[in-house]
């Protein structure tokens, strides 16, 4: 397991909101934020793991973003898409590529949304594809 020693680049609220807006333009859906507190909590999960839990594994940190955004439903629509793209974007800005097939992505993100995939299992899946 490769660890990341220096502090990663984190996803800003602006970046995640922009991902949401772009996904709605491309695929449709209801605009807006359903739960502001859930969004802030989801965006804080990865950094909190780094600062307070001393977590250094990028797939674990990426999973924190995905898990938080998919399971807390902070937006009115598009949470699964935003959660997955947050994973990919976080990995990308920290020098890691993600390479799962579209069908694998759909299967795993739907399992996550349905409560059939834990955050740890998501991290393992991400690790296998980076």
Predicted segments, located by residue:
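FIC/Doc superfamily catalytic core
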Residues: 1-130
């Amino acid at each position: 397991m490769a660890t990341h020693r220096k502090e990663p680049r984190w996803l800003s609220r602006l970046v995640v909101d922009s991902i949401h807006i772009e996904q709605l333009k491309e695929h449709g859906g209801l605009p807006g934020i359903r739960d502001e507190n859930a969004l802030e909590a989801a965006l804080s999960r990865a950094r909190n793991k780094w600062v307070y839990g001393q977590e250094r594994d990028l797939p674990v940190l990426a999973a924190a973003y995905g898990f938080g955004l998919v399971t807390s439903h902070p937006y009115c629509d598009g949470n699964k898409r935003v959660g997955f793209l947050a994973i990919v974007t976080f990995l990308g800005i920290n020098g890691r590529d993600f390479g799962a097939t579209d069908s694998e992505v759909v299967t795993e993100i739907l399992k996550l949304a349905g409560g059939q995939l834990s955050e740890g299992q998501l991290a393992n899946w991400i690790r296998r594809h980076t």
